[in-house]
Design a protein with these regions (language model features):
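Zinc-dependent metallohydrolase catalytic domains
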Residues: 3-158
Length: 158
């Protein structure tokens, strides 16, 4: 009985957190309304599994990156650790953003939004990183900045 209750409680907590990601990605306007066409919004429910994977991957990847730097004896907060003028943390997140950089036509944006279980690259970066506190620290993001999201609105699943 106790384990069933624990499983049910865990499932409810997971569903609540997952719904938070659904709402965040569904709130993104992919394409504005045009003529008789309504605005095209992200489909957070359809892309949920991949959005959760991106969140978990970012967290695990960043932890692994920091651990590898420490094992090499690198002080990631030192001036000597700068990479082309960026801190190691900044370089990590910039590389994530570069991975998903794309230039696509509106019709392809529409096709991908409707038929692909992955969010568009821009949203994989911008929505995901707004849930990652170390990203805020790396770039000094604060209230009022475009990428700011209050801690109580950040979704942390894994």
């Amino acid at each position: 009985v106790g384990s069933e209750m624990c499983i049910r409680d865990s499932a409810e907590k997971f569903a609540k957190l997952a719904n938070g990601l659904v709402e965040q990605f569904s709130a993104v306007e992919i394409m504005p309304a045009s003529g008789s066409q309504p605005a095209l919004m992200g489909n957070g429910q359809y892309t949920l599994g991949e959005n959760i994977a991106d969140q978990g991957g970012l967290r695990i990847g960043y932890t692994a990156f920091l651990n590898s730097q420490r094992k090499k004896g690198v002080d990631v907060d030192s001036q000597e650790a700068l990479i082309d003028g960026f801190t190691p943390a900044q370089a990590f997140y910039l590389n994530f953003a570069n991975l998903w950089a794309q230039n696509i036509r509106p019709e392809e944006m529409r096709r991908l939004t409707v038929g692909d279980v992955h969010s568009l690259g821009e949203n994989r970066v911008n929505v995901s990183l707004r849930n990652i506190a170390p990203f805020f620290k790396a770039f000094g993001i604060k209230q009022g900045d475009k990428m700011w999201r209050p801690a109580e609105e950040q979704v942390i699943i894994w």
